[in-house]
Design a protein with these regions (language model features):
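Cysteine-dependent hydrolase recognition
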Residues: 1-288
């Protein structure tokens, strides 16, 4: 069963919150607080929940909503919304390359929400994962466009299962926090911090060259004050985590973004210390 709660107000553009019935039932108050906050931010907001059996069901409701409201510009997937793992598409990943024939499917396939937000791409369903029933394998077809051109922007709010704990309480807490932040009109988003961790995007600095343009477009107020925007790289210090801890404790900081590899309970900040000078290359060994 799918439930669609339509926007309460008319706006030039629209947004969709998509969740599963179980998550909605356990976070209902927080979900509606978040919906109201997004609408107050100027976006007509749909709240869609369903008992999703596969990604195609979710995609069909997205397409239907888009047909009814062509001004739909973005969406967020909250909770246990099925995940599409795509094969035959590694030529469109930034750095991930793994032999699909030599490695297990769950390792060599690419989990991506481009399945939902890029309606130009064509996929062929293969099968459901035998262990994680929320994972579904698809193939990017040969006659599909071979470049990304998303129809919407999208995000996913999902609690990592391996972290254990009450996932619904955590999601509800996050949504209430996000709603409160949107409601605070006096606290402008003018202090932003971005950090790039080790081994991300193949450690290629060229990849990040145009990042500042995107930051200036999305967070213009941060560039109107001294030190309003900081962009750090893991190469700046080893270890970096203690300096990051100091920044995270700043009361005035509005947004902190990590670009790095991670695990459910850990983040990969620094790489092994590079041998860039004499002291790094020659370390006397102390023997007992």
């Amino acid at each position: 069963q799918t439930t669609v709660i339509k926007p309460l107000v008319k706006q030039p553009t629209a947004f969709a919150i998509i969740t599963d019935n179980q998550t909605y039932a356990n976070t209902k108050d927080a979900m509606h607080q978040y919906k109201t906050a997004v609408e107050d931010d100027g976006l007509a907001t749909y709240l869609i929940s369903g008992d999703w059996q596969n990604p195609d069901q979710v995609k069909q409701i997205i397409i239907k909503t888009y047909q009814e409201c062509p001004s739909l510009e973005g969406l967020v997937l909250i909770g246990d919304v099925p995940v599409a793992l795509v094969r035959n598409a590694q030529h469109m990943t930034t750095a991930f390359k793994m032999n699909e024939k030599a490695f297990p499917w769950d390792q060599s396939s690419v989990p991506t929400d481009r399945f939902y937000d890029d309606l130009n791409l064509k996929f062929e369903f293969i099968r459901q994962d035998s262990v994680n029933h929320q994972h579904f394998y698809y193939k990017l077809t040969e006659d599909s466009p071979q470049r990304l051109n998303p129809t919407f922007y999208s995000a996913r709010i999902k609690y990592p299962e391996k972290k254990e704990g009450d996932k619904y309480a955590a999601i509800a807490s996050y949504l209430k926090k996000a709603a409160a932040a949107k409601a605070d009109k006096h606290n402008q988003l003018d202090r932003v911090f971005s950090f790039n961790g080790a081994s991300y995007n193949s450690d290629c600095l060229i990849v990040w060259m145009d990042d500042e343009k995107a930051y200036m477009e999305n967070f213009p107020l941060a560039f109107g004050r001294q030190m309003g925007f900081k962009h750090w790289n893991f190469r700046m210090k080893h270890p970096m985590k203690y300096k990051l801890f100091s920044e995270l404790q700043r009361k005035d900081l509005d947004l902190f973004m990590f670009h790095e590899h991670g695990m459910p309970t850990g983040q990969l900040i620094n790489d092994e210390l590079a041998c860039t000078d004499f002291n790094n290359r020659y370390k006397p060994q102390i023997r007992n």
